[in-house]
Amino acid sequence: MASGEGILTDGQWKKLEIATHNSGSLSSSPKSHTLFADLNIKSPTGGKGPVAGIPNRHVRRTHSGKHIRVKKEGAGGKGTWGKLLDTDDGDSCIDKNDPNYDSGEDAYDGLVDSPVSDPLNDYKKSVVSIIDEYFSTGDVKVAASDLRELGSSEYHPYFTKRLVSMAMDRHDKEKEMASVLLSALYADVILPDQIRDGFIRLLRSVDDLAVDILDAVNVLALFIARAIVDEILPPVFLVRSKKILPESCKGFQVIVTAEKSYLSAPHHAELVEKKWGGSTHTTVEETKKKISEILKEYVENGDTYEACRCIRELGVSFFHHEVVKRALVLAMDSPTAESLVLKLLKETAEEGLISSSQMVKGFFRVAESLDDLALDIPSAKKLFDSIVPKAISGGWLDDSFKITSDQDGEKSSQDGKLRQYKKDTVNIIQEYFLSDDIPELIRSLQDLGAPEYNPVFLKRLITLALDRKNREKEMASVLLSALHMELFSTEDFINGFIMLLESAEDTALDIMDASNELALFLARAVIDDVLAPLNLEDISTKLPPKSTGTETVRSARSLISARHAGERLLRSWGGGTGWIVEDAKDKISKLLEEYETGGVTSEACQCIRDLGMPFFNHEVVKKALVMAMEKQNDRLLNLLEECFGEGLITTNQMTKGFGRVNDSLDDLSLDIPNAKEKFELYASHAMDNGWILPEFGISATQ
């Protein structure tokens, strides 16, 4: 190959070196071609062949005959405009010595290319890695530790959703592992509410999941059933989910499948736990059984070291609260074992085998179940109260437990009579929901002989109804009307509702729409004359200003003040036997017309009874009085007398009916000229026979 030295002169070589060194500072204008013009480069071949040292494909000749070097990127070069928005130096920076320097540009320096961090995005990426690693290793402790270190606990519902959705598309082994991990993380790493929120999100997205997972409905139903069996979801989750999901969506199908296919079968817990083969992990029930065996063996031989070793080998540090709970129950059930059990718990705490949080959690679980334990161990509460101070003084139970338990103790009466009353009333209410027999319920309450606890009964009645269907809610409202007439005072109702509203926030944890439902109960009580509108003011003054209870009372007032509030509230839960108000009015009119034309009194009374709406009997009174005026037939008063004598229509309902007629006398007089004279005659007769309250005469006169 020929040398380039024979082509260029020494002066030309020097100019070429200078040009190469300063190429970055040259203008990219098409007029800046003077360099190569100055070099005076000519082809020795007359422009017909390549020159040695200058590759042919990088040299082109312009129409003027000048050579121009072209960039390999194809975007021009010296003597061209170059790329759009092209810069000479990718690493260029702002020069403060430049005459055109603008200090404002510094503010943007380094910001243009800086990435924007999204915490949720980062969390999602990290969570997928944690789950994948867990499915590979099966190490619950590492997964729990990684999730705890990740922070961002507010995003944990997403972890629940992601874990289950990833497991749904894998083998049974991963499904079992996912269930085990959720049980491990429950309460310690992920809060119960976050577990519930995660499953709610899954239910709402199951339509999308079903596109990729054909049996998504069945698999998710099994996950929910397993969560309920493992006690990380409450059974009421099914009822609450149905209320917020449309019946047409697959999420609703999931709930129905879980309820009917998995949780209603005999021995469903065992079946659900073995559905995925149990993987390499033991189920919750098996773990509980092993814990019981360890404690039983320990009580027999007293070997603390061996018992600690066995507990450690279980490998369920997240479930140690169950060890604490079962140990305490064993100590209460067998007083001779108490000292050994306390010794074991102290040893596990000092060794760090059972953490402080697990110890407190175990004690809390026992405290919450004392009422049930008392059925088998009568002195359970007394024994438990004696164990707590020993544990705290021994240094293996945190002092915070005593403070909390004392506060709980203030809320729940120490009186054994009250505890027994609560148990008895639950049975009475449940029987009423099955039989719909109000007289029998009233007799049962009278047999209990504890009128001072009437507010407690009211609270328990509505609390149980809140977690049931509309039928039971309507039955509860009807019962309130009956109790107001027969057994309870207005003060009982006020105190009962205050108790309900004080605990409204706690109730809302289990019943999602509790506040709205309580507002309906309050408003319905006013419509049924169980409470007066002024009573709502009395209730409100006894509640904290910005509490959930106060908001509920405000909602009740809004419901009452709405147009046609009476009819709407009477229909809110179906109106007793399911009739709407207009149907009931039509039935009443027909039975009164039939009676007026020669019907039998006993038959008319039976028809009124069959309506099943004692809270609406004031409508019977009103229509009977108006019909008597229109027909000029006082025979209808005989029916009212018979109804009052049988207790079918109470004094309150009778008074309310007369009051409604009194309020509409001006309108009635347009069609019935002697309406006022007739009404005064009927009212006088009612007063003489004790049908209506004495106060009615004063208000009617006014």
Swiss-Prot record:
Superkingdom of the organism of origin: Eukaryota
Cellular component annotations (GO), alphabetically ordered: cytosol; nucleus
GO molecular function list: mRNA binding; ribosome binding
Keyword Lipid metabolism appears in the UniProt entry: no
Gene Ontology biological process terms in this record: negative regulation of DNA-templated transcription; regulation of translation; response to absence of light; response to carbon starvation
Post-translational modification: Phosphorylation by S6 kinases (e.g. S6K1 and S6K2) is modulated by cellular energy status and TOR activity.
Record motif Nuclear localization signal 2, residues: 458-465
Induction behaviour: Induced by dark and starvation but repressed by glucose feeding subsequent to starvation in a TOR-dependent manner.
Disruption phenotype: Increased susceptibility to dark and starvation, and to treatment with the TOR inhibitor. Decreased translation activity associated with altered ribosome patterns, especially in the dark and starvation conditions, in which mRNAs distribution is altered and rRNA abnormally degraded. Slightly early flowering time under long-day conditions.
Entry's family note: Belongs to the PDCD4 family.
Oligomeric form and interacting partners: Binds to EIF4A1, S6K1 and S6K2. The association with ribosomes is modulated by cellular energy status and TOR activity.
Function: Involved in target of rapamycin (TOR)-regulated translation control, especially under energy-deficient conditions.
Alphabetical list of PANTHER family matching this protein: MA3 DOMAIN-CONTAINING TRANSLATION REGULATORY FACTOR 1 (PTHR12626:SF7), PROGRAMMED CELL DEATH 4 (PTHR12626)
Protein name: MA3 DOMAIN-CONTAINING TRANSLATION REGULATORY FACTOR 1
UniProt source species: Arabidopsis thaliana (Mouse-ear cress)
